[in-house]
Amino acid sequence: IIMRTKLIKGLSQIQSKYDAFFIDLWGVVHNGIQLYPGAIEVLKNLNNLNKRFVLISNAPRPSKSVEKYLLNLKMDKVFLKNVFTSGEAALQTLKKNVYGKKFYHLGPQKDKDLIEGFEKNKTSLEKCDFILCTGLFENEEISLDYYKKLLKKYTKLKMICTNPDLIVHRGSQSEYCAGSLALAFEKMGGKVVYFGKPYPEIYNFCI
């Protein structure tokens, strides 16, 4: 069977065929700095037609944090009824201690709200049960070689990647995401569990 891709000019061409929509945020609805006016018009149209939609994001943070972020971008809160993030999907699993209790947080301080309430379980690479990867530490640590050296002795640990994206475009700038670190870890022989698009867990949680 040969599957043919049908190109469309806009969602309005197919929206009558579906009851619900999964809509990505970064790069679709906004660019990290501002909302895309055309995308907001689409959301207004879907809302007026009483179509259900979930705004999904590979942000390694709880859904509520992204809701606040979108409000700061001046998004109408009527569109924020269903926001779900890869961080939220990971959090729901981490609460059950599926991968152990003690973790090493590999990521920047801005993602600390993901581990709110779990701070006591944060520990060193030497003592942790698994690595919780939300991204690079801070802007000055932009070389993947730095992280390869850091993780070289710990490939027997499991890494939980809360953002499978390799890079993100913030305005006109490109930045590494947690997915780049996870890919490097896998190439070194480590095992990674991914939460976020395109992996099924985030969609299963939304449903």
Regions flagged by a language model, labelled:
Residues 2-207:
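HAD-like aspartate-dependent phosphatase fold
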